[in-house]
Swiss-Prot record:
Annotated organism of origin: Phocaeicola vulgatus (strain ATCC 8482 / DSM 1447 / JCM 5826 / CCUG 4940 / NBRC 14291 / NCTC 11154)
Family in the record: Belongs to the glucosamine/galactosamine-6-phosphate isomerase family. NagB subfamily.
Keywords: Allosteric enzyme, Carbohydrate metabolism, Hydrolase
Keyword Ligase: no
Pfam families: Glucosamine_iso (PF01182)
PANTHER family, alphabetized: GLUCOSAMINE-6-PHOSPHATE ISOMERASE (PTHR11280:SF5)
Associated pathway: Amino-sugar metabolism; N-acetylneuraminate degradation; D-fructose 6-phosphate from N-acetylneuraminate: step 5/5
This enzyme's EC code(s): 3.5.99.6
Name of the protein in its database record: Glucosamine-6-phosphate deaminase
CDD domains, per the entry: GlcN6P_deaminase
GO MF annotation terms: glucosamine-6-phosphate deaminase activity; identical protein binding
One of the record's GO cellular component terms: cytoplasm
Gene symbol of the encoding locus: nagB
Positions marked as site (Part of the allosteric site): 151, 158, 160-161, 254
Length: 263
């Protein structure tokens, strides 16, 4: 696992955007062989999305031959609801880049058969050849996507009940009213994320420090699902200084030293 420690949120967002753009460009994608990107929502990736939009406007990266699969979606929210992840992705990213609408895949939380929707999502990922780079955020409790503590580390796309902590955390997007937050969601599994060729996790702020410490220094456990990244051959966490507050001094210095040429 690589841990990239940047000074602040803006710096880590730019690093992540540059990394994603470099991977797309190196793949030289075509309509027949597109680059497949896994996309998160939430506040963590917003800076990266803004930086990627700028790189796209500057002609430094194109999304014409990029196919995306989003991590998750609430169950029961209309697609055009202001807090649906469909709305989030188009408003904050897709509307501002040269991606083709037919290349965007987001789980349908209003499907008649939710289990079939999840199975078909996995099938679509497999048929295109898997995900080249899965980007993700991390919750204060170490969850990735909606894989809450206790989730199977080999799990695939499925329906999940959200924990009280997550409902409270997400209520900030629903007028701070926990009763407005959907109680279930469709989410890719930990195994789905780990099946990607590369995984890039964004971790920022002191409130994520404990999760980062478990991800890097702790054992692999279902109670901190991000810890499963230790098993991935090409896992990267890019974080800011505040997120490193719980790391041992030796761990911090090790990653600062080994990655100094890449910062």
């Amino acid at each position: 696992m690589r841990v990239i420690i940047e000074s602040d949120y803006q710096a880590l967002s730019q690093w992540a955007a540059n990394y994603v753009a470099s991977k797309i460009n190196a793949a030289n994608p075509t309509p027949e062989k597109p680059f497949v990107l896994g996309c998160p929502t939430g506040s963590s990736p917003l800076g990266m999305y803004k930086a990627l939009i700028e790189l796209n406007k500057q002609g430094k990266v194109s999304f014409q031959n990029v196919v995306t699969f989003n991590m998750d979606e609430y169950v029961g929210l209309p697609e055009d609801h202001p807090e649906s992840y469909h709305t989030f992705m188009w408003k904050n990213f897709f509307n501002h880049i040269d991606i083709k609408k037919e290349n965007v895949h987001i789980l349908n939380g209003n499907a008649e058969d939710l289990e079939a929707e999840c199975a078909n999502y996995e099938k679509q990922i497999a048929e295109i050849g898997g995900i080249d780079l899965f980007m993700g955020g991390i919750g204060p409790d170490g969850h990735i996507a909606f894989n809450e503590p206790g989730s199977s580390l080999s799990s695939r796309t499925r329906i999940k009940t959200l924990t009280t902590d997550t409902i409270i955390a997400n209520s900030r997007f629903f007028d701070n009213d926990v009763n407005k937050v959907p109680k279930t969601a469709l989410t890719v599994g930990v195994g789905t994320v780990l099946s990607a060729k590369e995984v890039l996790i964004i971790c920022n702020g002191h409130n994520k420090a404990r999760a980062l410490q478990h991800a890097v220094e702790g054992g692999i456990t279902q109670m901190w699902t991000i810890s499963a990244l230790q098993m991935h051959q090409h896992g990267i966490i890019v974080c800011d200084e505040a997120a490193t507050d719980e790391l041992k001094v030796g761990t911090y210095k090790y990653f600062k030293d080994i990655e100094k040429a890449n910062l």
